[in-house]
Each structure stands twice: as structure tokens, then as C-alpha cells.
Amino acid sequence: VSAFLLNRSSDLEIIGVIIGHEMIHGFDDQGRLYDKDGNMREWWMDSDVEKFNEKADMYAEFFDSIEVLPGLNANGRLTLGENLADHGGIQVAWKAYKNATKTQPLPTIDGFNADQRFFLSCANGWAQNITEAENRHLTTTDVHSLARWRVNGALPHIDAWYETFDVKEGDKLYIPKEKRLNLW
């Protein structure tokens, strides 16, 4: 992706996130169970499976702790694969974006620098306005976290987001560095 195109359309950031998201599915809690030929079999080393499961459990626990509505928490086990892909997809897209812009910095537009616009585009891509009833329904049935948590559940675990927005202890979505999740 050229710096020129990134400067012209924030849509490319969200496209990068979606492509990264789909790539990560090949290595999430379900995709990792299939080998290069698409056959379902365990092909990882036992030590890698153990480390993966340990870290994946931390993601499930993090999302389980999110109170979506009074008396209703997210289901981190149900949404695990999608949450891993959301988090990983943003990181893949961020690295691609930084690589594409390293020799051609982008300008500040509307008071936001290019790095800030990257993360704002990620958030904007999941913007939605749904009813409480739909929130309840999706929380209990959908393998995807609610759109709000696809953003607010992923970004606070990405160091670049902290640096980009100068997020500090005491800020609403702040998570101490040692508690941030990182699967890869």
C-alpha cells in the first residue's frame, strides 16, 4: 500500500485490519488445528500448544470480565477466535502501515497525525448503534464481540496505541504494560 493511497483514504487502514484479521484466523484457536493441506490434525509442538492455550485463556478471561450490560458479561470463550484475530489483525495492519509510510511521512489532517488516524480508522470501522435487546442477543449468540469491544478490547493491549495517543495510567482504557495481552 503506497503512502499516497494511505493519505487519500482511511478505508485502507480498516481493509488492512480485516486482511490481517483473516490471516490470523489461520492460527487462532480453531485455525491452528488444520495443517497446510487443510487436514484437521495437531501439527504444533506440545510446548507451543501449551503456551498458546495459556495465553488464549488470558484473552478469554479478559473478555469474560467485560460487563456489556448490567448483569450480562461478554463470553470470552465464545468469542475467543474472533478476539485473537481482531487483536492480531490490528497489529499486522499497523506493521504494514508503518512499513508503507516509513520513507514518506503523512501529514496531520484535522488535528490528527497519521498514526492517530490509523487507530481512529480502526475504531470507526466497527462503529455501530444497536439496541439493548440486540446487545443482549449478540452477546449470547455471536462468535464476534460487540463492535465496541472489538475496539476497546483490542487497542489497550497494543503498545503503539499508548504511544500514539500518549495514554497514561489513570486514563479510561489504560492497562499496565505487564498485564497487556500479547499472543504472538
Positions of the model-derived regions?
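Zinc-dependent metallohydrolase catalytic domains
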Residues: 8-16, 26-184
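Single conserved hydrophobic/aromatic residue that forms the stacking wall/gate
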Residues: 1-7
